[in-house]
Regions:
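Gly/Pro-enriched, hydrophobic low-complexity segments
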Residues: 137-221
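Flexible, processing/modification-adjacent segments and terminal tails
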Residues: 20-21, 81-152, 172-174
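Positively charged n-region of N-terminal signal peptides that target proteins for export
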Residues: 1-4
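Solvent-exposed N-terminal domain segments of exported/luminal and surface proteins
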Residues: 36-86
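Short, exposed beta-strand/loop patches in secreted or surface proteins that constitute
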Residues: 64-66, 126-135, 156, 185-187
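Extracytoplasmic
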Residues: 40-42, 60, 128, 137, ...
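Hydrophobic h-region of N-terminal signal peptides that target proteins for export
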Residues: 9-17
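N-terminal leader/targeting segments and the immediate start of mature chains
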Residues: 16-46
Length: 221
């Protein structure tokens, strides 16, 4: 009987020891992410984003990415191409205004995805503090709600051996429009981790964005 009671009292302690220390995990992942970003700062790359409306390709944009001397990520659209035929006269002006509105919307959607892709130390700690965390088969998975705005949700998958991101899935809002997104990561042969693809769905606009990061090149020292 005494042994049974002792075992019962030990159960909570055993469960607590098995739990993941989320604060330490957040710090470890942030440390790995910061070290990886330092290596990524030596690269310049481009993002090709194809914009579909009702499953029809309407727009393609090319954006260049680089880090400035302050360590901040900078973006610059270097090319855009619309698949719609240009109209003349007043219709052409209306079409041009609509195209500008679409470009603005697409830009805001892609900026939203970057907010989930590149998180600060404080944001990561806050996220893991409220997240449900599990680990299985060498992969850490964490899910939390109300990350940036009320009602949003983010799930991250992290390689336990390196503490580097494998993917991020989120649902959020762009204005009042719902947005679902997924960012996937890959590694160079050197081990540097980087965002490879981004998929965004905006059902209110019947819009989908397929983006791929490409043409990575290291700066000349």
């Amino acid at each position: 009987m005494k042994k049974l009671l002792l075992f019962i009292f030990l159960i909570p302690a055993m469960l607590c020891s098995a739990q993941i220390d989320k604060d330490q995990l957040a710090l470890a992942i942030n440390k790995a992410d910061e070290a990886n970003t330092e290596q990524l700062k030596s690269f310049i790359w481009k993002r090709k984003a194809d914009v579909y409306v009702e499953n029809v390709l309407k727009l393609t944009t090319i954006t260049e990415f680089s880090f400035n001397q302050a360590g901040e990520l900078e973006t610059k659209i270097i090319d855009s191409e619309s698949s719609e035929k240009k109209k003349g006269g007043i219709r052409g002006m209306v079409q041009e205004n609509a195209a500008e509105d679409k470009m603005d919307y697409v830009g805001k959607a892609l900026d939203l995805s970057l907010a989930y892709t590149y998180m600060t130390k404080g944001q990561l700690i806050d996220f893991f503090g409220k997240a449900a965390v599990t680990e299985k088969d060498g992969i850490i998975e964490a899910t939390a709600e109300n990350v940036y705005v009320e009602g949003d949700k983010l799930t991250v998958r992290v390689e336990a051996a390196t503490n580097l991101f494998l993917s991020k899935k989120f649902s959020s809002l762009l204005g009042k429009d719902p947005v679902d997104g997924e960012v996937k990561y890959e590694k160079f042969s050197s081990g540097v981790n980087h965002g490879s693809t981004t998929l965004l769905n905006m059902p209110a606009q019947k819009m989908r964005i397929d983006a791929i990061n490409q043409d990575y090149s290291q700066r000349v020292q």
